[in-house]
Amino acid sequence: MIYPIALPDRLELLVTLGDEQRQFTVPTPETTLRDEVQHFRELLEKRTTNEYVVPARQLYDQLIRPMEGVLAAHHIDTLVIVPDYTLRTIPFAALHDGRGFLMDRYATAIAPSMHLTDPRPLQATPGTALVLGISKSVQGYVDLPNVATEVTAVHEIEGGDELLNDQFSRARFEAELRRVPYNIVHIASHGQFGNDPSQTFVLAFDGQLTMDDLERDIKFGERRDKALELLILSACETASGDDRAALGLAGVALKAGARSALATLWYISDKAAGELIVDFYRGLQSGTLSKAHALQGAQRALAADPRYAHPAYWAPFLLIGNWL
């Protein structure tokens, strides 16, 4: 587990490896790091240029390279990162060592804090997934035609219940979570995360599901002694410039009792998102991969497609919470 801490005159990297703890000091002031992070994020979203590689290498050299020897000595293959607020807007998977991405060598996951992390393997229960999506244009939002395909594909893999378009109403969502102790809730719809509760929502067919709605409904499942294992938010995006936005709805889900959440830092093509998500579920279904490794495999598969090789497509997916 890695705790990067940005201080006014330096960056401290705290690394926990079982019972062993190590600390590395990098002479990068907080203001410099913040500028590099912002530059990296801005370039990473530009799909027609590879200029992101320069800041990706700079950040790798500061955040990962100091601990490479320790990680190799302990045969580490998964990095669980508790990001300082300065680092919450970037995907660590897209850091670059000059030869390849961090994603090529490590699975990654984000822990908002150790208190919100429940490191137990996924408790798979066939047929207990609730898969919801909005593919039509509603409430002024553009249509997401590939969402229908994504919802069908996920439902075929996981089983459970499927609610598409007008079936996915706010009342139906609440009723379903009260009716069935679902293992997985998958929502493919427009949405936005933000520090401001008014900017944080997922779009149902007849209105917005707010943070309060989501927290209340997920907590009801927890009261039935069946905590939600995994919440997936596909086709959503974060509020621009908000360093806590990436943890928005996902963080609420964890506080409400969900063990893991998968969300994106920025909006990407619903077709690309659908392909990655389906590969992620297939990895989970294999029974041999952790959630972090299932995401890593899905990111690798998407990056291998020439249409989606740029990290703007595969990097924004973050696994938050339980990585096993």
What is each residue range found by the language model?
Residues 1-7, 11-16, 21, 110-113, ...:
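Preference for extracellular/luminal or secreted protein segments
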Residues 1-105, 117, 126:
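Domain-scale, conserved, charged regions that form catalytic cores
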Residues 5, 82-85, 132-136, 187-190, ...:
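Active-site-proximal beta-strand/loop segments in catalytic clefts of secreted hydrolases
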Residues 13, 79-81, 90, 132, ...:
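Residue-level detector of buried hydrophobic side-chain packing
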Residues 18-19, 36, 74-75, 82-184, ...:
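Catalytic-core domains of enzymes
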Residues 76, 273-324:
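An often Trp-containing, charged/polar helix-loop segment at the C-terminal end
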Residues 112-115, 119, 183-279:
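Catalytic cores of nucleophile-dependent amide-cleaving enzymes
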